């Protein structure tokens, strides 16, 4: 563990929003100017998992909780190999940290990954502004304190071009495929008891120890999704999002996961075409977040951009008197209209705004959710979904 030092205020820095609104703050980062879509997360904890979540690629993340950094960072809480957020916006940045797993401070972690931060920002006023207007592009600069909109115009224009591109290509594995070997950490226990009892029951019922082979179509998958799948004694193979139907089928998959990821699902229609072939083959499919939107678009559903998205650790979802608290991170949602014509069930609704949060099919062995059942960070109300999906696979194989 590194020793911490008390921080000075840092050098002046500017946050300039696309609509011309300016916030002044301080920064300890090396001099740089970055642009991205400004979004906010309402979680009180889990900042390391948030920053390394590939769904935040090309975004500037505002954390609404005022004190960030006091549990440090560690080797367990990575959700990808690096920080994916383009920039971090905070009220207070603590360099003093205390946690039994902590290895380094948040500031050291950000500097190691060369990610710009700006702190001493009135995050309450900033989030209210985003909520009342909408998510928009913004620029963080600790190079030019008196940055003007005119000076930032070219940077914002470039940011718009990037945001409207295929972001999955930036976060998907560069390999054709690789195998995931790490299960959930038994010492942390979260979710592990439900998995152990299920594995024992399935092996006893089916008199088999044969592992299921799960293919994960990587649109920006979080590591904890892979850890859950591996803990169910599955063989987990991650493939590039551009993998063809033939390339995936050569693995003879028992089930396919369409992962979470960043950006607009309408920008990756080629993935929709390929996933349709898996659906017609009646392979059990699980869609998570962006994967949920991709599956819905396979049935000609419309997707639309939310005003300020759902990003936090306490979003309620439910239907028919059952409710779960979920972790969410998305800026798009699926329109309801496709449900009736395609014989789908709405399994979950977002109880904050009524948007569609989960579906299953009458005709195909697939389920998808707009939230993150793996948590990380967040509650564990929905981790049963992995157990249920694995059960669907076994049921499909035995029928």
From Swiss-Prot:
InterPro entries (alphabetical):
Anth_synth/Amidotransfase (IPR050472), CarbamoylP_synth_ssu (IPR006274), CarbamoylP_synth_ssu_N (IPR002474), CarbP_synth_ssu_N_sf (IPR036480), Class_I_gatase-like (IPR029062), CPSase_GATase1 (IPR035686), GATASE (IPR017926)
Q: Which SUPFAM superfamilies match?
A: Carbamoyl phosphate synthetase, small subunit N-terminal domain, Class I glutamine amidotransferase-like
Known EC number(s)? Answer: 6.3.5.5
Query: Its catalytic activity?
Result: hydrogencarbonate + L-glutamine + 2 ATP + H2O = carbamoyl phosphate + L-glutamate + 2 ADP + phosphate + 2 H(+)
Q: Where is the active site?
A: 289 (nucleophile), 372, 374
What would be one Gene Ontology cellular-component term for the protein? chloroplast
* Stored PANTHER family: CARBAMOYL-PHOSPHATE SYNTHASE SMALL CHAIN, MULTIFUNCTIONAL TRYPTOPHAN BIOSYNTHESIS PROTEIN-RELATED
User: Know the name of this protein?
Assistant: Carbamoyl phosphate synthase small chain
Question: From which organism does this entry originate?
Answer: Cyanidium caldarium (Red alga)
